[in-house]
Amino acid sequence: MTLEDINHPHKGQPVLEKGRRPEDAAAAVILLHGRGASAESILSLERSLRDTVRSDLAWLAPQANYHTWYPYHFIQPEEKNEPSLTSALKIVEELLERLSAAGIPREKTVIAGFSQGACLSLEYAGRNPGRYGGVLALSGGLIGETVDDAKYQGSMEETPVFLGCSDFDPHIPEDRVHESAEVFERLGADVTKKIYEGLGHTINKDELNYFRAMIEAL
């Protein structure tokens, strides 16, 4: 095992693809799976939307090393989740660079995730603000023991940002969802926040409708 293997544990993991090749697509969606899940499982979102969204999309779903983007709960001290967290953020950056090289800019790319993947989606966009096609966080929030505003500086340039979560989720404190939405509002994103009564840790049809609308607006 090399030092790079230790510092970048997600390097070399597969990226599953659906839809058009990036070189042939007009827009893209990056899908980030949750803890214990897989790239294949998060691609079920593509299957759910396939017949009702535009067909000129590239869908990319990276696989986390050992099915986990970072080892501890997302509201643990950030250093406990290193180096896995930095490695996971780097994977998102590398996918965006790959899409850009294929002719798909960030403003034509949606970053979407569920659970750990939702947290990662928000954390990447918050640390790297700019105009994206959209950011969709299903059951997630910004990462860290507290929300450190100093990490999130710049402008989201009215990027659509959707946060959806249950009013009681055993993994996601509702307060963190509200705090995360406030950060993105401060950064100038077009924020939609939905708290669903009794939803639990899952995805509902209303969230899929928001996802569909975000994609269609690309």
Give a label for each model feature.
Residues 112-117, 121:
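Gly/Ala-rich beta-loop-alpha elbow adjacent to hydrolase catalytic centers
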Residues 111-113, 138, 164:
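Short beta-strand immediately N-terminal to the catalytic nucleophile in serine-hydrolase-like folds
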Residues 162-165, 169:
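Short beta-strand/loop motif that positions the catalytic acidic residue
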Residues 162, 178-218:
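C-terminal catalytic histidine-bearing segment of alpha/beta-hydrolase fold enzymes
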Residues 43-47, 148-149, 173-183:
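Short alpha-helix in the alpha/beta-hydrolase fold that links the catalytic acid
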Residues 4-106:
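Serine-hydrolase catalytic machinery in alpha/beta-hydrolase-like enzymes
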Residues 71-77, 140-160:
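Flexible "cap/lid" loop of the alpha/beta hydrolase fold
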Residues 130-143:
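A conserved short beta-strand
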